């Protein structure tokens, strides 16, 4: 571990102790030394015991900085991991940071375009229009045509900080999986990996440029959604130049009503945009929170959405789309057997799952929901209940479905705010049923076969070699499994001792920090204790990772 990582780890541990986040850890599942340490030391240092666990978690992430705030925002959609009380607190995290100097922004732009800013732009505003943890946005004009534009710039010096924090997130995820059996079920390393991928996509504005161009192409002739033009010649990894849009923020209901916007039609079009992106295009905007959506000033009776900030996008393959649509339709029809069969056929739950038990669990969860009027049943909650119930049957985490759930949560929140009486199910059902009918048409099947036939013909001469190769590979795999079983038996013997040493070392380190903070007369002893703890911890850690 590097010195920078150790310093940052100390800061993280201190924040965890200050906010009493040890409450997330079920102590009965810890090894003995860590159980003693958590009981007698961690809770003593909790300076915010009067707050709820969710509030403490939110404040801790805020204190750790913007990268952790964004991580918390992502975790807020993972209600399969956290209870609602915690997820609700995480959902109000605000990604707000002080802007960096406009002169520095100007220098970043000039470095990216390889020329002085005045060569291509005029009326550049040093005070940003918006500032966030990853980037900030400045307004200007293009010299050649006098068009209003915005210039998005990645915050300088961000990469080294992000790399350290991501590395520590991986370490924490690994420790959770080592010491908490429940942690393995949630695959925290995969959660961090998904966050890392999202974060680095946002750091590369060329990816956002490509996403924006694709979405603009998909809705080029649309009367319901407008995506602003990107000026590709000026775009790079750190700078993006695009058309400036003018519209009313979707959350400004007063302004929308003042210009006599057709709110019912606007809400219906929000649902239409979502399902069009998911089922027609298989390419959807994954960050459609209210801050990224505007309504055009033109034609309030025939309202049009404007969407920006396309750094995060998602896609579903044909199989996922089919099973998702079929699940919703089965839900409309109270067909829980069909829902169970779909989960099994899609591979979302293990093949050895008892289908009757799964069907019964679905009925138990959803039948009470149907006591409410259909228009009051939230789409996003149905998806959440569906995933949470399936989780108890060891459903694999599907990252693309998590992003879809987050997007649906945003869209549904916006739509219900615009027109509370809208029946989302009535709006969505015809769309889903039409899409399902289209998939079953003979013409659709013929088109799919025409696409695959050349590939099949090409592979026919290779079949004998492929079969021989697969037979050899299965024999090799059998031998590897036998070797692995022998190695696992050996490792199991040593693992308990390694965990004990690791736990003793961690407890001594925690105790030394506590003594160092609390008692000025025991500072030398606490340093001595810290060194011994690190030594024992290192021995245990090396044995664990071997």
Curated annotation (Swiss-Prot):
Superkingdom of this protein's organism: Bacteria
Signal peptide (UniProt feature, chain positions): none
GO molecular function: ATP binding; protein kinase activity
InterPro entries to which the protein is assigned, alphabetical: ABC1_dom (IPR004147), Kinase-like_dom_sf (IPR011009), UbiB (IPR010232), UbiB_bact (IPR045308), UbiB_kinase (IPR050154)
TM spans (from-to): 497-517, 521-541
Pfam families in the cross-refs: ABC1
Pathway: Cofactor biosynthesis; ubiquinone biosynthesis [regulation]
Topological category with respect to the lipid bilayer: Multi-pass membrane protein
Domain Protein kinase span(s) in chain numbering: 123-501
Residues of the active site: 287
Keywords: ATP-binding, Cell inner membrane, Cell membrane, Kinase, Membrane, Nucleotide-binding, Transferase, Transmembrane, Transmembrane helix, Ubiquinone biosynthesis
GO cellular component annotations of the record: plasma membrane
Keyword Transmembrane helix in record: yes
Compartment(s): Cell inner membrane
Catalytic class of the enzyme: transferase
Binding site for ATP: 129-137, 152
Major place of residence: membrane
Annotated GO biological process: regulation of ubiquinone biosynthetic process; ubiquinone biosynthetic process
Family note: Belongs to the ABC1 family. UbiB subfamily.
Function recorded in the entry: Is probably a protein kinase regulator of UbiI activity which is involved in aerobic coenzyme Q (ubiquinone) biosynthesis.
Protein name in the entry: Probable protein kinase UbiB
Organism: Blochmanniella pennsylvanica (strain BPEN)
Lineage: Bacteria, Pseudomonadati, Pseudomonadota, Gammaproteobacteria, Enterobacterales
Gene from which the chain derives: ubiB
